[in-house]
């Protein structure tokens, strides 16, 4: 429904929007964007629409630090990969931790606590 912009009733659309706004769903989506595969059995010939959920903050992966934090907010390990957000630099223990955060920064409580 959401990914293809399919028309549904107002109550059904409200149900979809509630799911798209749910932080747990958004974390799952972020990880899928980073490491997930497109599963062909879910594909349709219809044109897809842009992400219809809440707009995530724009962040970008950068090659070097230093970062404001020395330990990854998720694992507690030393940082090796970096992200820029709002002119600030944050570090992560690996590219996956950085990239899932880049996809939707504020849905990750451990990262949001750094801001």
What are these model-predicted stretches?
Residues 1-68, 83, 99:
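C-terminal alpha-helical interaction module
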Residues 20, 92-93, 103:
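A conserved hydrophobic position in a structured secondary element of the catalytic/binding core
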Residues 69, 87-90:
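Residues immediately within or flanking Cys/His clusters that coordinate Zn2+
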Residues 72-74, 83-85:
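Short cysteine-rich clusters marking metal-coordination/redox-active sites
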Residues 73, 91, 95:
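Cys/His/Pro-rich metal-binding microdomains
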Residues 78-79, 101:
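Cys/His-rich microdomains that often coordinate metals
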Residues 97-114:
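Short metal-binding segments enriched for Cys and/or His
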């Amino acid at each position: 429904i959401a990914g293809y912009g399919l028309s549904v009733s107002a109550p059904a659309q409200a149900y979809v929007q509630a799911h798209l706004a749910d932080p747990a769903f958004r974390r799952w989506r972020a990880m899928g964007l980073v490491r997930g595969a497109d599963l062909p059995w879910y594909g349709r010939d219809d044109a897809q629409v842009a992400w219809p959920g809440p707009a995530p903050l724009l962040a970008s992966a950068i090659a070097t630090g230093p970062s404001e934090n020395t330990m990854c907010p998720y694992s507690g390990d030393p940082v090796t990969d970096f992200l820029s957000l709002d002119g600030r630099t944050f570090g992560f223990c690996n590219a996956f931790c950085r990239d899932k955060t880049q996809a939707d920064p504020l849905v990750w409580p451990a990262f949001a606590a750094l801001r």
